Each structure stands twice: as structure tokens, then as C-alpha cells.
Amino acid sequence: MASQQAPAKDLQTNNLEFTPSHSSGVQWVEDISNSPSAQLNFSPSNNGCWATQELQSLWKMFNSWLQPEKQTKEQMISQLVLEQFLLIGHCKDKYALTEKWKASGSDMRRFMESLTDECLKPPVMVHVSMQGQEALFSENMPLKEVIKLLKQQQSATRPTPDNEQMPVDTTQDRLLATGQENSENECNNSCNATEANVGESCSGNEMDSLLIIQKEQYPEHEEGNVVFQFPLDARRASQGNSSHHVDFRSAPTPADVPMEEQPKDLSRENISEDKNNCYNTSRNAATQVYRSDNIPRKKTDSLSINKRIYHSEPEEGDIPYGVPQDSTRASQGTSTCLQESLGECFSEKDPRELPGLESRQEEPISDPVFLGKDHEANLPCESHQKRFRRDAKLFKCEECSRMFKHARSLSSHQRTHLNKKSELLCVTCQKMFKRVSDRRTHEIIHMPEKPFKCSTCEKSFSHKTNLKSHEMIHTGEMPYVCSLCSRRFRQSSTYHRHLRNYHRSD
């Protein structure tokens, strides 16, 4: 019988290594094909389904590991329980625990009798604070149970400065039991401590959820006597679903976070200071309106909403800049609250009659104008340009009659004329030419040696055309012939002169 042979068989858990694989969800290093239980008769998969192949592989693997034909149900269950206990991670030394399992003869009862708390890791305790009540809890305890225990402690004792820290009596057996019950949910949870801010909702109901806030990311900023908390990134967590290390704090109440400051005296002496701090004041007002969503909904009649508007317009002489007075921007999430608060503040009475604000006669505000030399700067663009063209002083160049608006532009332009004159003037005979090429051709005359020389008589010429005409003398060539008298000429100029003088009537 399998039950009689079971005590003599070792489960050999130390030879089984759990490794993940892409081809199957679980794979053991032990050779499955050599096991007699692995030779099972499966009908061949005609469609080649991957799910069917995966199930067949898992079937063979678990049969090879548990060996149901050799072991009883209790032995297989004991082996699964031991493997699950090792995977949870509560044991300190897995190798020592496996040796104890082998020493007990693979009997779960004997194995549990030999166990002590020395093989377990000490539980990690987390300091939790909620509405004045503080206690230490195990990291594996559910969040819902933590809140329940803190509520019981709060109802039993009222928080005082003397008993502010009261540890809850939680034994290790209870902590370990709680951790094993929630081990399935705790395998993927991190061990980073977070700070939870538990507050009442705007409707005044009991706590429905916890606001989990990272402690490192949300510092508190103080300004005077008003404390602002900026939740840059907050998320809601349901009760009993989170088992991270948490630290609860009570939400700020109207008594803890004052929303009103003492009214300031906006007298003539303080007007200049208000001008300089106009931007900072409006920025603080928007921040305080943003925080009004986390407080039970009341009438927001704070002075911080009013003081962002009534600052005199900065002026320069008698010309205002035209800067709008209200430059406060509120975030999207608080636009409704801002509209309600502004409607309540300004619909019933004049804001200038609020206490602490000195009432002044309303001065007429002129229309904003551009800061130009005179008030004609508001004219349309075309007329504006015409006026400047009409009033501008023009400077005329005497050489080319060009007009310039500035004297420095005229002087710069006249230098170009001087440069051109120096380029067009012959240095030897002071003769002026229209083009630079003509000046260069003329300068050849003043050279001691002409560049073009006759090869027959070695006479030199300044131009190539003159040299060609001279060479015709030596060759006797006369290319130009008169059609009327058949007379020949060497040069075209002589030919045309002959036509004008002798054949004009013809």
C-alpha cells in the first residue's frame, strides 16, 4: 500500500528547485521524463493549442513532484503546505527548516512540534498615528483592522499630552497569524512607510476612505500664523485593501488651520508696500482658496480673498499702465468654490466697506494708453507712421540726391562717394572716368612700356586693337571694301569716313 511505504520515503524537497520558465508557468529542475508517473496517456492535440500543452506540462510536473501513486493525500498536502510556508518568507533560514523537515521523517505533526519562534523573522512593527491616537502594528495587519483598533482606543481614552503615545497590546502569535492570513495579498506589497491623512469629507460623514500621502513629497509651508499643506499627489485607498506601513494623522480642522488673518490697515503709509507685494498677495490668496476644498464647506469670507483685489494701479506721471487689477488665477479644481466665495463676498456689500479697510473716494481711471512721447500714440498704425514721416528731419546727399533721416546715415553714405571717386580718378593725370574698367584702360597710357608689341617692327601699343591695325600694314590686308568705288580700307573708321565724305549723295 502507498500509505505503508510513505514513512520510508523521503519527499526530497531539498532536490526540488523552483524556477520560472517561458514555456510553462512552473518547471522543476528534476528530470520529469524519467519519472514513471510522468508516462501518462494523453490524447494528441490536433489543433496544437498552447493552453493544452501548458496544462499537460503542469500535470506531468506535479505528478513527478508529488508522486500520488506513492504518497497519501496527507503527505502531498503537507508537502504543499511546507512549500507555501517557504514562499511566504516568514522563515529566517530555509535550509535549516528543510533539514528539520527531513529529520521529522516528513511528518507534519512531528515537524510542527519541533518548531520554535527562533526560525522565524521578527515582525516589522509600524508606528501608526490617527486623530491623536498612536500605536505600533505589524506590517501584515490589514488597514481596516488598524483603524478599528484605533477607534476603540480613541473611544476608551481621550487624547491628552501625557498619554499621547499608547502602544496596543499585540502579541507575536496574533501578528504572525494575521500576517499568514493575508500572505497572499502581502507577497507583492512593498515595505516603504507612508503617511496617511484621515479626514472628514465635506458632507461631514464618517471616514469612508484614507488619503494616502507620501511623507517625503509633501512638506508643510508656514506663512505667518497660517499653515498651508500642499498635497501634490494624493490617492484614495479603500478600507482593508492596503497593508503598507501607514501613519495616520487627523485632518486639519477649522480650529487647527485658521482661515482668517487679522485685517490689515491699508492706509496711505502702507500703499507703497502693497504695491510691491501685490503679486505675492494674490498668489497666497489663490493658494488659500485651493485649500478650502479640504475643509468642511462653510462660507469662505476670508480676508485673503479680498486683499488680492484692492491695490491701487501703479502709475508713472499721469499716465496709467493699464495693468488689470485682478491677476489672480485659481486652479481648475477650485473654480466652483472660488466663484461661490467671491459671490458671497461682493454681492451683499461694497468691499471697500469691509472692517480694517480705509474707505477712499473712487478716482476716475483713464483709459490705458501706450507709453509714448505724447498721447497721439493711440492713433492707428498708418497715421502714426505718417506723423513720424512728416515730423522727421531729412538729410539730403549732394552727390546723388538721396534722403536720409539721420545725420550719421548721411555721413556713412558720403564715404561711399569718396571711395568711388578715389577709384575712378586717374592718379597721374587726375582724369575722372565713369567706370573703373575705363580708368584701368587709361592707366596703360602712362606706363613706360606698352603691353602689346609688334613682332615685325617691335613697336608697342597700349591696346590690342591698335596692334592688330598696325599688323595689317605689314601684311597688306584691307578687309573693308567700298561697294560704290571698290576702294579698300584697313580700319572700319576710315571706311565709314569715306562713305560720309564721298558717297553722301548716293
Swiss-Prot record:
This is Zinc finger and SCAN domain containing protein 4D. The keyword Cell inner membrane does not apply. GO terms for cellular component: chromosome, telomeric region; nucleoplasm. It is found in: Nucleus; Chromosome, Telomere. A zinc finger (C2H2-type) spans 395-417, 424-446, 452-474, 480-503. PROSITE patterns: SCAN_BOX (PS50804), ZINC_FINGER_C2H2_1 (PS00028), ZINC_FINGER_C2H2_2 (PS50157). Keywords: Chromosome, DNA-binding, Metal-binding, Nucleus, Repeat, Telomere, Transcription, Transcription regulation, Zinc, Zinc-finger. Gene3D superfamilies: Classic Zinc Finger, DNA breaking-rejoining enzymes. It comes from Mus musculus (Mouse). It holds the Pfam family zf-C2H2. Residues 238-264 are annotated as: Disordered. Transcription factor required to regulate early development. Binds telomeres and plays a key role in genomic stability by regulating telomere elongation. Acts as an activator of spontaneous telomere sister chromatid exchange (T-SCE) and telomere elongation. Highly expressed at the 2-cell stage but its expression is rapidly turned off.
